[in-house]
Amino acid sequence: MNQPSSLAADLRGAWHAQAQSHPLITLGLAASAAGVVLLLVAGIVNALTGENRVHVGYAVLGGAAGFAATALGALMALGLRAISARTQDAMLGFAAGMMLAASAFSLILPGLDAAGTIVGPGPAAAAVVALGLGLGVLLMLGLDYFTPHEHERTGHQGPEAARVNRVWLFVLTIILHNLPEGMAIGVSFATGDLRIGLPLTSAIAIQDVPEGLAVALALRAVGLPIGRAVLVAVASGLMEPLGALVGVGISSGFALAYPISMGLAAGAMIFVVSHEVIPETHRNGHETTATVGLMAGFALMMFLDTALG
């Protein structure tokens, strides 16, 4: 009966040990988390007053679109007994391509433009966005390091992961994956510019469909009944509207908060793609199929950005 409290105590001890053994990662997580909190505090009042309330509404609707797409993909698992590993890797590669292109076309480039109007074009603008990129990478690196989770190829990751139920490990992995997507949606609507928000939200929603399906099938593979696996996969999509609120909050406080937050969201998404998604698509020897899927997703996002931007 003391197992949960024992696990919590062990996690606290493991976190302390990891912090001592890897001080740079710990410092990076602390710095990035502090930066996010400061941006959020600075922006929360501004985001909820005046015309910015409309921007919050856009962000929530965008996050809801991501949630609905995840739910649609998860529900598709009810009619599928299984899909081949090659098909799954192609779908995840497609999602990775859309995330990479969204990071470039809908976050980094608009971030550079926004920073250029504040500090002037050139190296100064690039430095502002690069600061955000660094914060995003440090945030996700720290969360990845200190959060127990599991990957199909590398197994248990993070402190005390071997003692946590496999279903919860997958859920934590999904949370780590969906949070930056939701943040990106929120940041893209921070100024109310639909030319930035719509392409990015469309891209994330499109790639959320195969992701939702893959999550439901993965949860079924670790032992959950199909109905419960679908429900958990659907619920995982709630991180997107929650992340969208965080995203619009951190980017609405002051002028430089917007380009910094664009870089932060891009850095977080690129980290997830490189650290999580692409390695998973290569685990079964389907690198070529996954790469073709990635390029198709990248091209589609480029088209969406041109057509809707």
Swiss-Prot record:
It catalyses: Zn(2+)(in) = Zn(2+)(out); Cd(2+)(in) = Cd(2+)(out). Changing E240A: Loses metal binding at M2 but does not lead to significant changes in either overall structure or metal coordination at M1. GO terms for molecular function: zinc ion transmembrane transporter activity. Cd(2+) 1 binds at M99, H177, E181, Q207, E211. The keyword Ion transport applies. Changing S106A: Is more tolerant to high Zn(2+) or Cd(2+) concentrations due to a decreased metal uptake ability. GO terms for cellular component: plasma membrane. Belongs to the ZIP transporter (TC 2.A.5) family. Homodimer. Also exists as a monomer. The zinc flux through ZIPB is extremely slow in comparison with typical ion channels and is nonsaturating with respect to a zinc concentration up to 2 mM. This is Zinc transporter ZIPB. It comes from Bordetella bronchiseptica (strain ATCC BAA-588 / NCTC 13252 / RB50) (Alcaligenes bronchisepticus). The lineage of its organism: Bacteria, Pseudomonadati, Pseudomonadota, Betaproteobacteria, Burkholderiales.
